[in-house]
Amino acid sequence: IDLPDNQAPLTTQTRREDLDSPKFQGTKTSIDFDSATGTINLAGSGLFDTITDFDAVGSLDDFGGIASSGTYDFGGAAGSTTLDLGGVFSLDLKRHFLTEGFYPSDLFDSRGLIDDMTDFDGATATEVNAEMLVRVTQDNPSGSPTYTDFQTFANGTYKGRGFQFRAKLTSTDTAQDIKVSQLGYTASLQRRTEQGNLTASGAGAKTITFTHPFFVGTSSLLGANTNLPSVGINAQNMASGDFFEVSSISGTGFTVHFKNSSNASIDRNFTYQAVGFGKGG
C-alpha cells in the first residue's frame, strides 16, 4: 500500500493593494490616492476648472466638499480586475481591511498653535463608512462572464472561478472623509481526500477520473501543475512479482497500469486514495 502524505491547507494568493509598488493600482471611481500618507480616500466633488481663487482653497483634492461615495476595484494581482482560479472551486477568503475616518480640514499639520487646540486628537468623523465587497462568476472571466451582484465580503467559503473585489467608501457629511491604509485578502483551498471504490484495472493502462477536480496551480497562481494531488493505490489479488505504475497525474485524474514479473499487462482489482487541494465542479 502506497499512501499519500497529509498536507496543510494551500494559500493560493495573499493580495495586498497597499504593499504594491506603486500602491493602490486598482480602478478608482471618485477615489484619490494620497501619496503623502500612502492611502486612498474619497475625492473632492468640485471641478478644477471652476476654482476662481486658488489661495482660498485649503485642499485641491477636497475642493467642493467630499464626494458622497466612491469605489476602488481590484483583483488577483497589481492593477488587475479579477482573481481567476482556472476552474470552479470552493475558495476560502479572508479579508484584510484597515480604515480611518477624518476631517480633511482638521489635519494636524494644518492647525495653528498647540496652545489654541481644544482637542489635541482632533474631531472624530462619524458620518463615514467603508465596506469591502466581493462578487463571483463560475464562467471564464476572459470570455463573457455573468457575475453575481457585489455582496459584503465576510470571511468564509465562496464557490466560483473568477472573483472581483471592491472597497466602497461613503460619507454623509461633505466635511468628513475616510481613508484606507490596508486593503487585501488571503485566498486558500482546503486539503481534501478522495477515495475510489474497488475497480478492475483490465489488462492495460486504466484511466481514472476524479469525482471532483483538484486545484493544481495556474500560470498566475503558484505556477501551473505545481500542486498535483498525491495518489495512493491499494492493490488486490496480487501475485508474486506483480507491480503497478501510476502516471499522468493531473487535477482531473491519473493512469494506473498493472504488470506481472514478465512486464506483461495484467488485470488486478484496486482502490485508490487521492489527497490534494480544492473541490472543483
How would you describe each model-predicted region?
Residues R191-G281:
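Extracellular attachment/recognition segments
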Residues I1-G204, I208:
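Beta-strand-rich ligand- or partner-binding modules
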